[in-house]
Amino acid sequence: MTVKTRFAPSPTGYLHIGGVRTALFSWAFARHHKGEFLLRIEDTDLARSTAESVNIILDGMKWVGLNYDNADNVVYQTRRFDRYKEVIAELLEKGHAYYCYCSKEELEAMREKAEKEGTATYDRRWRPEAGKTLPEIPAGVQPVVRFKTPLDGVTKWADLVKGEISIPNEALDDLIIARADGTPTYNFCVVVDDYDMGVTHVIRGDDHVNNTPKQINILKAIGANLPEYGHLPMILNEQGKKISKRSGDTVAITDFGAMGILPEAMLNYLARLGWAHGDDEFFTMEQFIEWFDLKDVSPSPSRMDLKKLYWINGEHIKITTNEKLAEMVKPRLALRDIHETSKPALEDVLALVKDRAQDLNALADECLYFYKKQVPAEADVAKHWDDEASARMLRFAERLEGLEDWNTEAIHDLFKPFCDEEGIKMGKLGMPLRLAVCGTAKTPSVDAVLALIGKEEVLKRIRA
């Protein structure tokens, strides 16, 4: 059997990090088992689904690097209405579905009664049964189609995350599978799609647990093999509450990209939300695929920890090639009015500073003074700069100008003799030198920084 999983987002807005975590686990499960990972766009909500939102999903999947095996044949539910109508007709013909002519007022009265009695909402008055007389069909009412849910027994499954789950069928409604205008409903479309796509494992959020028994019963009615189900726990914010954009939480995957998070780091972090492999916190996607097993997913909710996300991001920055980092940092430097990054080469700058930043925005800031002297902070000036320091910098500039070989080692060899002559410690030279050349007291080793900036530029900045 070829393992087939799917990710099935609705294009009604941004791509939520919870959705990306679901996609990640489905993707990793398929890749671990040498199977297929498929994408389906559940766009039957015609009022809310937009082409822009579809592109947001596709772009988000591309950004995080979750490749799907049906890239040339992504399933769109709105293109499958004929297929849904075909299956509905089959269910009606075989007695697994029926027409219901209840009015909105009747359904509202049933709902209120059910809430008081704790029973299923719909009283099944239009459900055909042996020896039962159905009401007279009202004039001018377009019926819905309801699925004929079994009245006895239980629907159960061995959830790959939550364990055994059992739901009495008497607690389930005869759910609507086609609205009065003929459009199919979510739970029905999902079943037909999973069946036609050959999905073997449905991995999704635990907000779908209540949908599962309904979908299992429909699958049984159409004679399909049942997939296995695994329901993932919710992701909570740092306060332990449901993630919400209204609460100020970052929820869209694109927002994390704007925050300077690497795609690989985002996936690494999301993988650790609810799943564990010993004490491993930092790993590659190749390692994750090798290690991933749904039995290691906790059924309990996970809590966001932005501090840990940034730490993981910093670790991924360290192992990312300077060439790849340069492509991501250049646009950020352009936003900071730095457009020329060949002198010094940005790749060389990144090699020196990438250990000092935990996100791409901070990394871009670390590169600024290599291309343009920054305005020193008042606190740094007060602490490290005075007339004596200014005069000392001019004297040291003469030593620098005399260097024939301009490199880190040659610059470093000037420090001790100069400090001895001046009767000062290295801090009295290094900190003012950083301010004079870079405009900040916080840099990597100052000899390496000067070597990269270049002799002519260094002397010009000191003497400015």
Curated annotation (Swiss-Prot):
An example Gene Ontology molecular-function term: ATP binding
Statement: the UniProt record of this protein carries the keyword Cytoplasm: yes
EC numbers for this chain: 6.1.1.17
Compartments, as annotated in UniProt: Cytoplasm
Amino acids binding ATP: K245
Alphabetically ordered keywords of this record: Aminoacyl-tRNA synthetase, ATP-binding, Cytoplasm, Ligase, Nucleotide-binding, Protein biosynthesis
GO cellular component entries: cytosol
Motif ('HIGH' region): 9-19
Chain segments annotated as transmembrane: none
PROSITE patterns noted in UniProt: AA_TRNA_LIGASE_I
Pfam families associated with the record: Anticodon_2, tRNA-synt_1c
Catalytic activity of the protein: tRNA(Glu) + L-glutamate + ATP = L-glutamyl-tRNA(Glu) + AMP + diphosphate
GO biological process: glutamyl-tRNA aminoacylation
Top-level taxonomic group: Bacteria
Annotated motif 'KMSKS' region, positions: 242-246
Class of enzymatic activity (EC top level): ligase
Assembly and binders: Monomer.
Entry similarity comment: Belongs to the class-I aminoacyl-tRNA synthetase family. Glutamate--tRNA ligase type 1 subfamily.
Function as written in the Swiss-Prot or TrEMBL entry: Catalyzes the attachment of glutamate to tRNA(Glu) in a two-step reaction: glutamate is first activated by ATP to form Glu-AMP and then transferred to the acceptor end of tRNA(Glu).
Protein name: Glutamate--tRNA ligase
Species per Swiss-Prot/TrEMBL record: Neisseria meningitidis serogroup C / serotype 2a (strain ATCC 700532 / DSM 15464 / FAM18)
